[in-house]
Amino acid sequence: MSTNPIQPLLDVLYQGKSLSREQTAELFSALIRGEMSEAAMAGMLVALKMRGETIDEISGAADAMRAAAKPFPCPERNNNPLHNGIVDIVGTGGDGFNTINISTTAAFVAAAAGAKVAKHGNRSVSSKSGSSDLLAQFGIDLTMSPETASRCLDALNLCFLFAPHYHGGVKHAVPVRQALKTRTLFNVLGPLINPARPEFMLLGVYSPELVLPIAKVLKALGTKRAMVVHGSGLDEVALHGNTQVAELKDGDIIEYQLTPADLGVPLAQISDLEGGEPAQNALITEAILKGNGTEAHANAVAINAGCALYVCGITDSVKAGTLLALATIQSGKAFELLSQLAKVSGEAHVNGQERGR
């Protein structure tokens, strides 16, 4: 199919000018439909990268991908005063560190503490073991149907949504992204296109320069409340140093720093959080969720779960959130939740409910 309809938009980019939100959505819609050549795709991504993507351009790309995503049937939002919305705990990846699966493990803890967590994840980007790599170790079906995932969210407070299962059109960009061998707009899009459309987000970014822009994008996309964080090199709240935060609340964005002391836990070394292959990380996650993890592992997970609990309104401060997360870890409830999710996932698969996707 001819790429002529989008050529004028590409020409704008090649001239070093920016596109509107609607124009960017039009370009990315063409990409998702498979109507853009790989050469044009590479040109578009490089032109955006070299100039630096605007808030409108990131928002427009997210609009297109959200619109094209496989629908997710969200359970009733307001059937419980505590559950005034869904939260995601997610990072861009690509921070260059091979840590344990902090955000994935934190999702179990936050859910066991009362949050409704719909975690949007993919296979590994920078570490040896991404969210989906870890879940597979526990027998959690990465391709469970949207209906089964929704039932898990309703009954267990938690579901995991495997990005490629909901965003099939992204496959057209894979060869180009692999050939370019550099970060592109796609590296920040993943956390922005959760098909559950969470009202609340704890979103970690790989660069401190992205913290404020991504908070502005979340505001543009209609996110109710969020913390965008970069923790001393990590795409999550840091246990080994300061965390830069841009918090979106009531339509305003405020910037500040958090230290481990602010969260009520001692400083640790980044080496204390080193991860391994999926099988090794699964053992670490299991130990943490049973309350048997190292102090550093438990605290790293708790400060991230705690910030998520704060963002979705279950606690009124990040420190209170961290304390609730630590108590939840010690109770073993988070591991019970993991076991229940694996059981439901396995039963759905065996019963054939996952066929015909």
Swiss-Prot record:
Q: Where does Mg(2+) 2 bind?
A: 235-236
Q: In which pathway does it act?
A: Amino-acid biosynthesis; L-tryptophan biosynthesis; L-tryptophan from chorismate: step 2/5
Cofactor(s) for this UniProt protein: Mg(2+)
In terms of superkingdom, the source organism counts as Bacteria
Whether Transferase counts among this entry's keywords is: yes
Task: State where anthranilate 1 binds.
Answer: 91, 122
Which terms are listed as keywords in the entry? Amino-acid biosynthesis, Aromatic amino acid biosynthesis, Glycosyltransferase, Magnesium, Metal-binding, Transferase, Tryptophan biosynthesis
**Catalyzed reactions per annotation:** N-(5-phospho-beta-D-ribosyl)anthranilate + diphosphate = 5-phospho-alpha-D-ribose 1-diphosphate + anthranilate
Q: Membrane: is it a keyword of this entry?
A: no
Q: Could you say which EC number(s) this protein's record lists?
A: 2.4.2.18
**One annotated GO biological process:** L-tryptophan biosynthetic process
The molecular function terms of the Gene Ontology recorded here are:
anthranilate phosphoribosyltransferase activity; magnesium ion binding
Naming one, the record's GO cellular component terms include: cytosol
Binding residues annotated for anthranilate 2, in chain numbering = 177
Recite the UniProt cofactor note for this protein. Binds 2 magnesium ions per monomer.
Entries under InterPro entries matching the protein: Anthranilate_Pribosyl_Tfrase, Glycosyl_Trfase_fam3, Glycosyl_Trfase_fam3_N_dom, Glycosyl_Trfase_fam3_N_dom_sf, Nuc_phospho_transferase
Family the entry assigns: Belongs to the anthranilate phosphoribosyltransferase family.
Q: Which PANTHER family match?
A: ANTHRANILATE PHOSPHORIBOSYLTRANSFERASE
What does this chain do?
Answer: Catalyzes the transfer of the phosphoribosyl group of 5-phosphorylribose-1-pyrophosphate (PRPP) to anthranilate to yield N-(5'-phosphoribosyl)-anthranilate (PRA).
What the entry lists under HAMAP family is as follows: TrpD
| Subunit description | Homodimer.
Q: What is this protein called?
A: Anthranilate phosphoribosyltransferase
Source organism per UniProt: Shewanella baltica (strain OS195)
Query: Which gene is the coding source of this polypeptide chain?
Result: trpD
